[in-house]
Amino acid sequence: MAEISKMAGVSLATVSRTIHSPHLVRKGTLERVNQVMERLNYVYHATAGDLSRKRSSIIGVIIPTAKSLVFSSTLQAIQEAAQQNNFSLVAGSSKYDIETELSLLQQFKERRLAGIILTGFVVGQKDLIKELVKGGMPCVVIWDKLDDSDLSYVGFDNFKATYRITEYLISLRHRHIGLIVGPYTKVERVKRRLEGFKAALTAHGLKFDPELVIEKEPTLIDGKEAMSRLLSLPVRPTAVLAASDTLAVGALAAARDMNVRVPEDISIAGFDDIEVAAYCNPPLTTVRVPAYEIGQIAFKILLGMINGNSDQLQQYCLDTSVIIRGSCRELDNDVISKS
């Protein structure tokens, strides 16, 4: 923790609060400390003495990135529920990398943790999770709906959620829609978002154009770079769906820098409904994801497994909703004729 404190320019107490009570830390400080922890691939080891006891009181949690506020919301819910039940957390970030995620899972297995909460799947990693479960490790997968799965999960239908927001853009008469999406070649749930986007276009007789799809890490700078590319195309899209609000905020910045008005010249929609989405200029149309509720339910399921109260498969697919704000508008007839 001392190295994190030094690199982030904050006190050890602030680092501790970031880990234990992130809701008490200012947003800018929280993001700075989380970025340093992610850069160092830091894993917090709580109450290490529990490892020598018969039953551990530590739960492992793997999230894709500490930079995203939406994953922080899920982590906060798990942390609060864990504290109420006298459990502590080991939290790690996979950085959307399969080797990093497998390494974290192996560490958790070797430390004989009480259970694991895992954010979806990096492509190619599902078999290891099944091995852990068969070996007696309680495990709950979050942030995705797993079809034909023998694993407990709490998530939502990424395919359907993306289909709906794409269909909303189509209802505004957009026919030339760009997509800025996370690492779909690495992450199963992100791949399903791409598939939902494609399916909505096909269902409405629209052609899928790979040139309008840009794969990026879900960061502000990547969202800005991707949007700049889309706006520089000979025929640019009339609407852009960013498959995370972080990417969408970056896209808004790019449009502003290039003097492209939102929504007058181009519509932009996001995904997640993080807190800042409502305060963007213009406020961001997006998909509301029950991030906090996912964490609460996941811990409840895991606690039942740990206590031996439930050996049945539990699978929750929660609802999402399209939140309509000011960043999208219906196309005028003259624009449609040109697109």
Can you annotate each of these PLM segments?
Residues 38-76, 84-87, 95-97, 107-110:
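N-terminal helix-turn-helix/winged-helix DNA-binding helices
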Residues 1-57, 329, 338:
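N-terminal helix-turn-helix DNA-binding module of bacterial transcription factors
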